[in-house]
C-alpha cells in the first residue's frame, strides 16, 4: 500500500523515501538485543573523551565508526552537506504475566499515534516513538492489549533516547566519494550506519 508506506516514511523521517517495511515478503529478521552495545564491547579497551586530529592518521589501517559529519570536520572536507536526522525514543519493558515465545512487529503510520513501531521479542516488548513520550506506561499497556491481544502487567520499563535515530540520505555520489577518499588518503575504513551515513538494518550486518 503506497499510501501507508509513504505516511510511515513521512512520520519517521519527514521525507517520502524507501523504507524496509515496503517489503512484505516472509523473511527472517533481526532486532538488536537491549544490551547489544555492551555485548560487542566486551573484551575491548575503550577510551572515552579522546581527541582525534587529522595528523594522527599515520597510514595504519583504521576501522572507523565515527559519524560522517564529524569525520568530514576532522579531515577538513570542503563540500560538507546538511545531514538530516530525527531523534527517537525507545521504551523497553518485560511482559510479566505470560510466557511469550513469538516475535512480532506492528507499524503505526498514523500521525495521531505518538509511536511508530511496536515489537514483541518473546517476553521483551519495545515501543518506539518519534517524539518524547509522556505516558509510556499507558501506551505500552494499551498497545499490548488492543493490538497484540496481551492483557498483562509489565515490569522493568525504561525509555532510551537515540539522537540520530532516523537518518535521511545525502547525495549518494558525494557519500561514496568521501568514503573512498578516507580509504585512499588515510587508510580509514568506515563501518556502520553513521560512519557510512546509510540506513543499515541488522539483517544487513548478519548477512
Segments from the language model and where they lie:
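N-terminal FAD cofactor-binding segment of flavoenzymes
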Residues: 1-10
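Helical element adjacent to the flavin cofactor pocket in flavoenzyme catalytic cores
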Residues: 11-61, 65-73
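A structural signal for well-ordered alpha-helical scaffolds and beta->alpha junctions
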Residues: 29-37, 86, 111-112, 137, ...
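A short, acidic, amphipathic alpha-helical segment used as a generic capping/interface helix at domain edges
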Residues: 39, 113-114, 174-177
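Central helical "cap/lid" subdomain
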Residues: 51-113, 122
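Short catalytic/ligand-binding loop motif for oxyanion handling, primarily in non-cytosolic enzymes
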Residues: 70-74, 114-117, 135-136, 197-200
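Conserved flavin/dinucleotide-binding core of flavoenzymes
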Residues: 121-207
